[in-house]
């Protein structure tokens, strides 16, 4: 079984940024999450706090993230991670049909929002 340098669980801004940084620094990467990236990101009407990209909307930023992943040839594995095991010098990453290995794991699952107001979940971004 081939061992990746870093497994990243989550394809929101933090997970994508970690994957890009790792790849640029010559590390092998396993990126787990949705190919559609973060639904919170894609629903955002306007993002004003992302460095270098003032007034971009979430869908545009998600497309820029996808393009950057494509250029660096970082695939997204949509298999659900069901468990992570510390194995001493490495980690075992369990999916429904495979056990993968990585020297390091980054959990970038985002945040769980509180109970939304009526219809808020459709408007969040």
What is each model feature region?
Residues 9-14:
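Glycine-rich Rossmann-fold phosphate-binding loop(s) that bind the pyrophosphate
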Residues 15, 38, 56, 114-115:
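Flexible, glycine-rich phosphate/dinucleotide-binding loops
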Residues 37, 43-52, 113, 119-120:
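Glycine-rich, flexible loop/turn motifs
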Residues 19, 23:
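Gly/Ala-rich phosphate-binding loop of Rossmann-like dinucleotide-binding domains
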Residues 42-99:
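N-terminal Rossmann-like dinucleotide/flavin-binding domain of flavoprotein oxidoreductases
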Residues 17, 36, 64:
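Short Gly/charged-rich anion-binding patches and loops
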Residues 7, 24-43:
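Glycine-rich FAD pyrophosphate-binding loop
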Residues 1-7, 25, 76-125:
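FAD-binding core/adjacent interface of flavoenzyme oxidoreductases
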């Amino acid at each position: 079984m081939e061992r990746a340098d870093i497994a990243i669980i989550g394809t929101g801004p933090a997970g994508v940024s970690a994957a890009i940084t790792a790849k640029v620094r010559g590390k092998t990467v396993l990126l787990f999450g949705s190919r559609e990236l973060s639904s919170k990101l894609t629903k955002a009407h306007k993002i004003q706090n992302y460095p270098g990209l003032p007034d971009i909307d979430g869908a545009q930023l998600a497309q820029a993230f996808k393009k950057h992943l494509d250029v660096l040839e970082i695939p997204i594995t949509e298999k659900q991670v069901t468990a992570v095991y510390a194995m001493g010098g490495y980690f075992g990453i369990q999916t429904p049909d495979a056990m993968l290995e990585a020297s390091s794991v980054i959990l970038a699952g985002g945040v769980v929002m509180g109970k939304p107001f009526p219809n808020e979940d459709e408007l969040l971004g």
